[in-house]
C-alpha cells in the first residue's frame, strides 16, 4: 500500500462523516473494500466517470477538511511525541534502580499506553 492510499484512509477516519452519503459509499467501496471503479459502476448502476468524479470530489473534500482543521496532522504529531516519551521511559527503566521511581515510571507508562494502544 502506498502512502497516499494510507493517508487518504486516515483522512476518512477523521472526516468521513462530513462527506455526503454517496461520497462515503463510493469511497468505502474503493478504499476500504478494494473495488475497482468499474465494479463500483456496475454495482451502483452509474457510469464509471460518475464514480471517478464522485471519488475525486470525496478526496478533495477530505483534503480540504484537513487543510482547514488539521486534525490528522495534530494526531500524527501527538503519536510521534508519545513514541518519543515511550522510548525515554524504556531508557529510564533500564537504568533506574530505585523501586519508588520505577513504580512511578510504570504508572506513567500505563497511562501512555491507554492514550496510544
Curated annotation (Swiss-Prot):
Pfam families: UPF0122. It comes from the Bacteria. Might take part in the signal recognition particle (SRP) pathway. This is inferred from the conservation of its genetic proximity to ftsY/ffh. May be a regulatory protein. Belongs to the UPF0122 family. This is UPF0122 protein Teth39_1278. It comes from Thermoanaerobacter pseudethanolicus (strain ATCC 33223 / 39E). The lineage of its organism: Bacteria, Bacillati, Bacillota, Clostridia, Thermoanaerobacterales.
Amino acid at each position: 500500500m502506498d502512502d497516499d492510499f494510507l493517508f487518504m484512509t486516515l483522512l476518512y477516519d477523521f472526516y468521513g462523516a462530513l462527506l455526503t452519503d454517496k461520497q462515503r459509499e463510493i469511497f468505502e467501496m474503493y478504499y476500504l473494500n478494494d473495488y475497482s471503479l468499474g465494479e463500483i459502476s456496475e454495482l451502483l448502476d452509474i457510469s464509471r466517470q460518475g464514480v471517478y468524479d464522485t471519488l475525486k470530489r470525496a478526496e478533495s473534500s477530505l483534503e480540504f477538511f484537513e487543510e482547514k482543521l488539521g486534525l490528522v496532522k495534530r494526531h500524527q504529531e501527538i503519536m510521534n511525541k508519545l513514541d518519543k516519551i515511550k522510548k525515554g521511559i524504556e531508557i529510564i527503566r533500564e537504568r533506574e534502580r530505585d523501586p519508588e521511581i520505577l513504580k512511578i515510571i510504570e504508572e506513567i507508562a500505563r497511562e501512555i499506553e491507554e492514550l496510544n494502544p
